[in-house]
Amino acid sequence: MRIICRQIVLLFSGFWGLAMGAFPSSVQIGGLFIRNTDQEYTAFRLAIFLHNTSPNASEAPFNLVPHVDNIETANSFAVTNAFCSQYSRGVFAIFGLYDKRSVHTLTSFCSALHISLITPSFPTEGESQFVLQLRPSLRGALLSLLDHYEWNCFVFLYDTDRGYSILQAIMEKAGQNGWHVSAICVENFNDVSYRQLLEELDRRQEKKFVIDCEIERLQNILEQIVSVGKHVKGYHYIIANLGFKDISLERFIHGGANVTGFQLVDFNTPMVTKLMDRWKKLDQREYPGSETPPKYTSALTYDGVLVMAETFRSLRRQKIDISRRGNAGDCLANPAAPWGQGIDMERTLKQVRIQGLTGNVQFDHYGRRVNYTMDVFELKSTGPRKVGYWNDMDKLVLIQDAPTLGNDTAAIENRTVVVTTIMESPYVMYKKNHEMFEGNDKYEGYCVDLASEIAKHIGIKYKIAIVPDGKYGARDADTKIWNGMVGELVYGKAEIAIAPLTITLVREEVIDFSKPFMSLGISIMIKKPQKSKPGVFSFLDPLAYEIWMCIVFAYIGVSVVLFLVSRFSPYEWHTEEPEDGKEGPSDQPPNEFGIFNSLWFSLGAFMQQGCDISPRSLSGRIVGGVWWFFTLIIISSYTANLAAFLTVERMVSPIESAEDLAKQTEIAYGTLDSGSTKEFFRRSKIAVYEKMWTYMRSAEPSVFTRTTAEGVARVRKSKGKFAFLLESTMNEYIEQRKPCDTMKVGGNLDSKGYGVATPKGSSLRTPVNLAVLKLSEAGVLDKLKNKWWYDKGECGPKDSGSKDKTSALSLSNVAGVFYILVGGLGLAMLVALIEFCYKSRAEAKRMKLTFSEAIRNKARLSITGSVGENGRVLTPDCPKAVHTGTAIRQSSGLAVIASDLP
């Protein structure tokens, strides 16, 4: 029985082979791949594998055997050699990719040898009988979209990699409709050229662009658009590409620009979904490119294998013998020897109609795609969204927008918003034990608390991300690229910036700011000068040097005037009445205001002490009165200032204002290298600030610092030879931090504010702005500043860091007074000694004594008050004989002492 069954099977197989004709069980196909097509090759291999392993024998009665070559398109000999190698292996059809350098070589060989080429590359401009174009044409869809937007003035950026078909169609339509199209070929552009072009177009107020380039060049152009900030609201870009979802547009989402494009692959269809499940399981090491979703060119590659498989099935059903000898001959023979069944293969390929990853796959008799549908996408705040579709029959059809949520922030509630900030005390700092925490809990500071408050008000989840380059945000003058936190927002890496970010015009052009949450200005930070030690004669400080000199001259002048008026006024001369028993009056009437008494009177009045003599004449009293008035005012003013000067420790600052900085060169000064302060000086038209900017720009070594901490450290280490220009809020904070050796001097140079920043046109702008206003009105912002500036200060209360500090008097404050006292006492002793010696010498001559005897007698009298030797009395001054008896009389102001003699 078993033998009979086997014979029946063999007989059936024989009849089946006769019925199907001589169709090979292994179909040889070729594959030509160019550089940077790893994902397309993976799709090619996957399609062949799935066909050959299909469990349905009716769908896969034969195996596809690929012969693959990688070609270097720049080398025409290598292209020719690869094609001839494929031809010599007896392939029935070739799947291949080309570029503008290899397209003519491949199409020429195909036409000469009747070998069909199935390609996902750009459609050729001419008619090639044996070339099947898997990629649909964009001409009709693009023109319909331009009509819909009613564009009549726009820029068309293109390269020649894909030919001129779209350019030709647009220029023809422009001529018919009167459009103004600026067509620019960007084939040989580099990054700098792109930025220069975009800047020039921006000066021309060009806001509408059509970009027709291959994916690599297209992605580069989009990056340059972002780098110059032209991806913001007000710009509109139409991308002439069939893979809208293949393009990285995250930065455009945050920028706000309108971006429209086309999508050939519908990822929601069952066939694509099934393939995606299989695609995700591929080993990335064996199948390069499988780590990312398949691009539309990879989907076209997959469909190309399906087209070839369906063609061979159709030929098999038609019993067309396509078998070839192993050696197909020389492809370079002259004349060419075409393949005999090539016409049948070409005709059958064009008759294929299947449903592939790119939708309906069907060709006309020229080998071009027909009856296809492509979706129209626009970039929304949530990502690419389908807004319509286009096909040959219906043309452009726009679908009604699906109902949106109540506000755009509702879509954000389900994801985590990236908040960019900068490590800057006291705004954002690591906690002391931050290693024990994760995420946002690692940080503390003013902006950390502010971010938490804002998130509560608008109801979002957020993640704090420290800006990698540690900069606030400035635009490079050469590359036009934004750095810092502004760059993070502009290029779509973050959605909110909560940091000490100054609101400026140039930043406002590319990002949006909320209302200011803190007001401030540019200020000057210097190293706190050492407290001046009081000098020995610090008690002289209340009056200037000039005043003291004037007082001395006034004292001398008043004394001389008093002496003169006393001499000329008869009322100052008087005669003493003699007492009973005494001699008559002196020949010279006495005048008390000699020059020395005049000096003594003026000094006593100045010292508020007075003396035993007073002027008698009216003129003398006038002199005395005005001198008393003068001394009253001077002494009162001196006393009032003396208390302050002796009880206040002063710090003498070498700089008090920006003008002081500008007019000197001994103290260097600088700003943060990237920020609004530097931009302020660069753009300022005020003479003082222009002078400062000229100095800072040319100073060597550079006075610009990478971070604020670096600038503060430079101030502290410079020994007073460097001043740092920074925001007043930061200046005030650092002044309250140990080692308490910096200080703010002068007023603010300008007035500005910090704001919360969002990308241009972001849906978060309004909610964030309202949250800041609510926090301001509720007093939360003031509480946060007091908390992080003063409550956590390390240098005592705010007033204690003032410039002048009151303290108790120390010996050094009044040491000069003691020096004068000691000096005066010493001088008095010296004068007394001189007087003693002088009078002793005079007495020795008068009494005919030796000088030593006179000294001894004088000393005995000075110490004991006893009489001299031999009963003689020594008197200091006695021009006349002494009478017997005890009496005291006045003569010339000198007291004469007499005693009874035995």
UniProtKB/Swiss-Prot annotation:
Signal sequence interval, chain numbering: 1-20
Reactions this protein catalyses: Ca(2+)(in) = Ca(2+)(out); Na(+)(in) = Na(+)(out); Mg(2+)(in) = Mg(2+)(out)
Positions in the Extracellular compartment: 22-544, 639-813
Disulfide bond positions: 84-331, 740-795
Transmembrane segments: 545-565, 618-638, 814-834
Subunit and interaction comment: Homotetramer or heterotetramer of pore-forming glutamate receptor subunits. Tetramers may be formed by the dimerization of dimers. Interacts with EPB41L1 via its C-terminus. Isoform 3 interacts with PICK1. Found in a complex with GRIA1, GRIA2, GRIA3, CNIH2, CNIH3, CACNG2, CACNG3, CACNG4, CACNG5, CACNG7 and CACNG8. Interacts with CACNG5 and PRKCG. Found in a complex with GRIA1, GRIA2, GRIA3, DLG4, CACNG8 and CNIH2.
Family named by the database record: Belongs to the glutamate-gated ion channel (TC 1.A.10.1) family. GRIA4 subfamily.
Domain notes: The M4 transmembrane segment mediates tetramerization and is required for cell surface expression.
PANTHER family: IONOTROPIC GLUTAMATE RECEPTOR (PTHR18966)
Protein name: Glutamate receptor 4
